[in-house]
Swiss-Prot record:
Keywords: Acetylation, Ribonucleoprotein, Ribosomal protein, RNA-binding, rRNA-binding
PANTHER family linked to this entry: 50S RIBOSOMAL PROTEIN L9
Gene3D superfamilies attached to this UniProt entry: Ribosomal protein L9, C-terminal domain (3.10.430.100), Ribosomal protein L9, N-terminal domain (3.40.5.10)
Protein name per UniProt: Large ribosomal subunit protein bL9
Gene name of this polypeptide: rplI
UniProt feature coiled coil, ranges: none
Gene Ontology terms, MF aspect: rRNA binding; structural constituent of ribosome
GO CC entries: ribonucleoprotein complex; ribosome
Matching InterPro entries: Ribosomal_bL9, Ribosomal_bL9/RNase_H1_N, Ribosomal_bL9_bac/chp, Ribosomal_bL9_C, Ribosomal_bL9_C_sf, Ribosomal_bL9_N, Ribosomal_bL9_N_sf
Source organism of this protein record: Shigella dysenteriae serotype 1 (strain Sd197)
The family this protein is said to belong to: Belongs to the bacterial ribosomal protein bL9 family.
Main function: Binds to the 23S rRNA.
Length: 149
């Protein structure tokens, strides 16, 4: 199925690219999320007329994401208290929701879907580096300090 991309999509293309994807991927993911439209003659003409407007909107979203990433980077460290045993092993774990709540409480609004934990959930006390994917191209890092209650 031919679609026109309205946003940058990983491993597929960027704004304005006309790509061929499987019908289910287009119908169930790209079109409902507003990342693509079917490549009909009407849509191609409509897109070409609005191309500059869409590019400006994309640049505005990227600038807002960069501003949020700078705010997150400015936090540097966030402390989370959790129950732990004698050797520093946590009872339970600290996941994306806990980290997102702690950063939001520190003053920067973050969704749990933006938190990236490359080594999985945090299960020990100490300092852990956590990254945030604010936009497909914009990342921020924060040190999460886990202390025992």
């Amino acid at each position: 199925m031919q679609v026109i991309l309205l946003d940058k999509v990983a491993n597929l293309g960027s704004l304005g690219d006309q790509v061929n994807v499987k019908a289910g991927y287009a119908r169930n993911f790209l079109v409902p999320q507003g990342k693509a439209v079917p490549a009909t003659k009407k849509n191609i003409e409509f897109f070409e007329a609005r191309r500059a407007e869409l590019e400006a909107k994309l640049a505005e979203v990227l600038a807002a994401a960069n501003a949020r990433a700078e705010k997150i980077d400015a936090l540097e460290t966030v402390t989370i208290a959790s129950k732990a045993g004698d050797e520093g092993k946590l009872f339970g774990s600290i996941g994306t929701r806990d980290i997102a709540d702690a950063v939001t409480a520190a003053g920067v609004e973050v969704a749990k879907s933006e938190v990236r934990l490359p080594n999985g959930v945090l299960r020990t006390t100490g300092e852990h580096e956590v990254s945030f994917q604010v936009h497909s191209e914009v990342f921020a890092k924060v040190i999460v300090n886990v202390v025992a209650e």
